[in-house]
Every structure is written in C-alpha cells, then in structure tokens.
Amino acid sequence: MKSQQEQHFDYVKIGIASPERVRQWGERTLPNGQTVGEVTKPETINYRTLKPEMDGLFCERIFGPAKDWECHCGKYKRVRHRGIVCERCGVEVTESRVRRHRMGYIKLAAAVTHVWYLKGIPSYLSILLDMALRDVEQIVYFNAYVVLDPGNATNLSYKQLLTEDQWLEIEEQLYSEDSQLEDVEVGIGAEAIERLLQELELEAVAEELREGIANSKGQKRAKLIKRLRVIDNFIATGARPEWMVLNSIPVIPPDLRPMVQLDGGRFATSDLNDLYRRVINRNNRLARLQEILAPEIIVRNEKRMLQEAVDALIDNGRRGRTVVGANNRPLKSLSDIIEGKQGRFRQNLLGKRVDYSGRSVIVVGPKLKIYQCGLPREMAIELFQPFVIQRLIKSTIVSNIKAAKKLIQRGDESVWDVLAEVITGHPVLLNRAPTLHRLGIQAFEPILVEGRAIQLHPLVCPAFNADFDGDQMAVHVPLSLEAQAEARLLMLACHNILSPATGKPIVAPSQDMVLGCYYLTAENPGAQRGAGRYFSSMDDALRAYEQGDVDLHAYVWLRYLGDVETNEADDRVLESETLEDGSILKIYRERKVRETAEGEMISQFIRTTPGRIIYNKTIQDALDLTERTLPEGLPV
C-alpha cells in the first residue's frame, strides 16, 4: 500500500522566488541521470501525429506522458513499466496526471525586469533604487543609459541618466589615446537594473534611512519611511532585491494551459501558449544574434522586444500596447488568470464548492424567532440525507442504504417525519457573501418550509447586510458534535446582538418593523367604530377588534391595574364624583380611577386603542418569556 505523506502547515506565504528556486521548480533529474526541464522550442504539437513536440511547450520528456503509462515513441505501454525511462524518447513511464503539476522553465538570453515590481503601485524598483519611475522605465526599455560607476570622471555621478548622444561623447573620450578617464561603467536595460540592485547593501541603507528619518520631517520623512518599510520587508523575508529581475521564467504545467481539438479538426488553445511562444521565439532569436555577434543596436532592440514579451506574459496591458489574438481580443496573461472575482484565488481556492452545503434566494420570515430560519424541504432532505438514512435504518423502516435512497427519491411520508426529527436541535450555518466580519456567518435552528427559498428573520439582516431584493445565501451543515456545539453556543443569532466592531446593537428594528410599530400606536380621530367602549381585559378588547366591532385606532377604555407612563404627567383630576357605595371616581385626561374613601385604588380604566394593546401585549409576552428562561438571580 502506497504511504501518503501528511504535511501540516499554518499558512501559505507568497514571496519573490530566487532564480535558483525557479530552476528547481522546472528542473528534474530522470532515473537515467538525464536533466530535463528547459523549454527551448516554441512548438506545441505536431500537426500530423498530434503528439507533443520534444523540448516544446507540451514536451512529454519535461512534463510527463500525455497518455497513462505510455512513452512518446510507444515502446513502453502498460502500468508494469512504471518508472522506466524510455531509451529512445527519454519519457518517464508514469501517469498522465503529472502534467497537472510538473513545471518547466525558459532560460532567458538576457535579464528582464518583473513588470509587477516595475509598474505596480507603488513601484518597488523605483522605491528601492531611490529613482523616479520614469527614469527606471527609460533604463529598462533601452531609452537611456545609467552610470554604474563614475570612475574618475568629475562630470558623472552614480545612477546618473545619459542619453545616447551623451554616452557616445563619453565613449569617444574613454577610448581616445590621451584619455584620462578610468573605470567608467555605464549600463542599459534590465542588466543595469540588476547590477544596481546587487550593489544595494540593505542593512547599511536601512541604518542610513533610520538616521535620515530622525533628522527630517514632512514629505521627505514620509518618502524615507516608505523606502525603509520596503527594505525592512526584504530583510525580514530574506529576499534579495535583484530577484525582481528575471533570468529564468517558469513554464506552468501543460494541463493548466490546455490545447484541445475541436470537431472541425481545428484546435482551441489557452492564451498562455501564445504568450509563451512569443517569449521563446524572441529569446531564441536573441541568443542567435548574440552568437553571431550582431551589431549592438540590433541586439538591444531584440532585448527590448524580449522584455515586452515577458511583460505581456506576466501582465498583458500593464505597460505599452496590449497583445491581442484573433478578433482583436486581448490575450489573458498570468495576472488575468489569478486576479479578480473569477480568478484562481477567489473562484477556485477561496470559493471552493463544499459538501453538505446549499444555496438559495432569501425571503422574509416574519413568524420566525430570531434564532430560526426557514429551510426548504427539498434542500433539507438533500443536506441531511446521511442523517435521515441512518435514522431510517436504525428505526427498521428500511434495511439498507439503497432502499433508504429509493424511499427518499419517492418522497415517502415517513421520510418527512424522520427529517423533522433529524433537524430538531441540529443548527445550520447561514453565510452571505461577502463575509466582511464575523457576523456574516451565523447559526440558526432550521424550520422546514414549503417552496424553494430560505426564510430569514428580518432583524438579522443588518448583520449580514442582506435585503430581500434577490439576495442569495449559502447553508452549511455542521457535522461533528463539536461543530454543532460551537454553532449553538457561539454562533446562534440570538447570541450576536452586539456588533463586534463598535459594541453597539446590530440587531435593531428598521423599515417594515418601524412602520408597523408606528401604525399600531398611531392616532386616527376618524376611527369611530366601537369608540368609547369599556373592556375588562386585553383579551376582550382584542377579541372585539378581531370580530370587527372596534377599529384598530378607535379610543376605548381598558381595565388595567398597572402603572401607565404618558408623555406629560397625568396627575391633574379633571372631574371627581362620589358614587352610591361611597367610593370616589376620579377622571383624569387619560384614565378613570375608582378609589375607596381612604384613597385605595379599586379599579382603573385607561384610554387606549386596540393597536396599542397589541403592541404592549407583544412586548410584555416577550419580556415574560425572557424572565422565565433566565437563570435565577440574573437581571432581566
């Protein structure tokens, strides 16, 4: 049995790769001792045999066989030849899936700068070299020379830019017989940038910058701090500045940039193959020109074209003219593949599909408790299927998994009863993208509902930043008992009343809820049906309203012995009357109170409306429930 090596890690760090690391990614030594990995030909596949060309972008020797357990020439076939390297074609006999992770590399005939570090915001190359971005660009794209060593020349300084004419003038002086100039060095292109970066002593520069920061202020200080921060990061990560200049380019595995044959015999290919082909063609042409000692101006032009080809491969359109393919469509570069919402990180790595999850539109569930959500039956039976199958077998309704699945597909009544049992006390997690803070994912107790939409309590909407205009939410089922316990104790919606950012309540009524509260408690002098009637209890008043005897906003008299708060103090007796039994009836603005001669209250009727009774009763019921559920001794 093949042993699997487990690797535990806490995080993935993305940094600059050294030239040696790039070579290590692509270079492999075959069991026969041969070293492979360098892609030297721009060809992809042979148009007659439809097999990958050797040393090309789909080379089987570099990336592995195109067919499982079969070499390029066909000498070795079948799994019994596993690990053998064919003597004729040099292809290792292994599985074709290695073509998804084996990389190659292109050894460049001239150094090129990485466009991210040159044209990114901020430009790290210009910050490290302490030069203007425009000047660095002129050097990289062969528009200006830079002084690498002024030697004994008094009119030159380190990192000074020179035009073509200025350099020719200095060159004439340098090579004349009576020249006094010595050790003057001038460079151009990415090689000059690489030399300047190699000469940077990071520790010494950092020390100088710290002294400069202490003695300066304003804009100059901010600029020094910016440069120091970049240098400190390089020191901390152990990366060297010259690694921002590339001498080798990694070639990603061929199955990640495929070429497929269409019905008409034509081929559809990834844009990356075209971009790699441009780089290889220009690189090979440059190597040939250097070999035949071509004039400097031609070599320099080819180096600039190589720089532009590598720029287009890494980030097409970042600088200069965008490289286009058929129909004038811009080619998708490596940056386009990994960046943005549809990129590799957000789409495929962070946004992976997971088991035991579903997704649907949310609608309001006004009758739900704050810790509940309405889960469509169709979704619930799919999410909780393993639990339902286990319960069906345990309760001997079916004898095996196959029979249980058939029962579920038929939608048998017994299945729904079992599902209701399974979801009782089993919380689910609801998540709404984008999850910007921890309240973007909360736990709820599921309630089975008809339809295909998830029902959500309106009070939790602010935490999710959700509304009901077509928003979608994802449902996840915590499987283990530990996950369920965490969901219930830490993530249940009723435990997340306060915002973790501000400490203020995030669960607050809004929109329909505020309007409903206003409508229930509003005054309407036109509502006269049942006005002035007396009711002995809240239930009597609500019954009369439900039967249509009283308007929602009609003023009625309700027997109520509790304290009543009003906007203005209601303690002025408007009228007083002594009744036959000796008791006294006192009439105030908002209430009628009957007292004994000694001043003890016998009864009290308050002036209110059925709407206000509904509002008060709802709040009172909620408070009574809280009092009953709180442990003894805790304040309400």
UniProtKB/Swiss-Prot annotation:
UniProt-annotated binding residues for Mg(2+): D467, D469, D471
Species for this entry: Picosynechococcus sp. (strain ATCC 27264 / PCC 7002 / PR-6)
EC number: 2.7.7.6
UniProt-listed InterPro entries: DNA-dir_RpoC1_gamma, DNA-dir_RpoC_beta_prime, RNA_pol_asu, RNA_pol_N, RNA_pol_Rpb1_1, RNA_pol_Rpb1_3, RNA_pol_Rpb1_3_sf, RNA_pol_Rpb1_clamp_domain
PANTHER family with a match to the protein in the record: DNA-DIRECTED RNA POLYMERASE, DNA-DIRECTED RNA POLYMERASE SUBUNIT BETA
GO biological process: DNA-templated transcription
A matching Pfam family: RNA_pol_Rpb1_2
Lineage, broadest ranks: Bacteria, Bacillati, Cyanobacteriota, Cyanophyceae, Oscillatoriophycideae
UniProt keyword list: DNA-directed RNA polymerase, Magnesium, Metal-binding, Nucleotidyltransferase, Transcription, Transferase, Zinc
Protein name per Swiss-Prot or TrEMBL: DNA-directed RNA polymerase subunit gamma
